[in-house]
């Protein structure tokens, strides 16, 4: 356990509104300060009833059908509470409570869903964020020439997306922030 380790998280959801939409998948991983992946947490698919899945818009329905997530959601036996307990068990082996910012891409959106459906997990993070999307926005505005050097696949599966977020931050660190 190390208080300098970083917790990375990604959620896949039925939509963007936590008042109506639900979590479909959650994944976490741990890096050190140099962004080396130390461990990958459980990748958990959360059951949602068909009535909830029918509320998804066209983009979410197509994307989560194409990548196989909806099939896994329909056969999952886990609910949000089960998933939260399993993720916390993993995190407690690597990072003390309240010591890591929430790391990932557009993690403020993920935090809204965690607060609504997995509040104990949400409270494990510090109040801070390490949001790769913010750095991306700055790079696009200040160094648009760097856009072409990074190829992302965005499978819209939780583990693959956070692995890409770590790679993305490594790229920005090397070419945009220049601290190597």
Swiss-Prot record:
Keyword Ribosomal protein belongs to the record: no
A cellular-component GO term for this protein: cytoplasm
Top-rank taxon: Bacteria
Active-site residues, record numbering mapped to chain: 127
Subcellular locations according to the entry: Cytoplasm
Function: 3'-to-5' exoribonuclease specific for small oligoribonucleotides.
Sequence similarity: Belongs to the oligoribonuclease family.
Source species of the chain: Blochmanniella floridana
SMART domains the record matches: EXOIII (SM00479)
Name recorded for this polypeptide: Oligoribonuclease
GO molecular function, one term: nucleic acid binding
Keyword Nuclease annotated: yes
Gene name of this polypeptide: orn
Record EC number: 3.1.15.-
Domain Exonuclease as annotated: residue spans: 6-169
GO annotation terms (biological process): DNA metabolic process
UniProt keywords, alphabetically: Cytoplasm, Exonuclease, Hydrolase, Nuclease
Main location: cytoplasm
């Amino acid at each position: 356990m190390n208080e300098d380790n970083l917790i990375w998280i990604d959620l896949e959801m039925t939509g963007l509104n936590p008042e109506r939409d639900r979590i479909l998948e959650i994944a976490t991983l741990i890096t050190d300060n140099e962004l080396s992946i130390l461990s990958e947490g459980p990748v958990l698919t959360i059951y949602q009833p068909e009535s909830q899945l029918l509320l998804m818009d066209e983009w979410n329905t197509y994307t989560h059908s194409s990548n196989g997530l909806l099939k896994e959601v329909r056969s999952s036996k886990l609910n949000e509470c089960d998933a939260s307990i399993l993720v916390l068990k993993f995190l407690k082996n690597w990072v003390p409570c309240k010591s890591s910012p929430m790391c990932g891409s557009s993690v403020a959106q993920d935090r809204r869903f965690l607060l609504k459906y997995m509040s104990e997990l949400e409270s494990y993070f510090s109040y801070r964020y390490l949001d790769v999307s913010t750095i991306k926005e700055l790079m696009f505005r200040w160094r648009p020439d760097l856009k072409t050097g990074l190829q992302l696949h965005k499978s819209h599966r939780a583990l693959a997306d956070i692995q890409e977020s770590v790679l993305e931050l490594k790229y920005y660190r090397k070419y945009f922030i220049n601290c190597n």
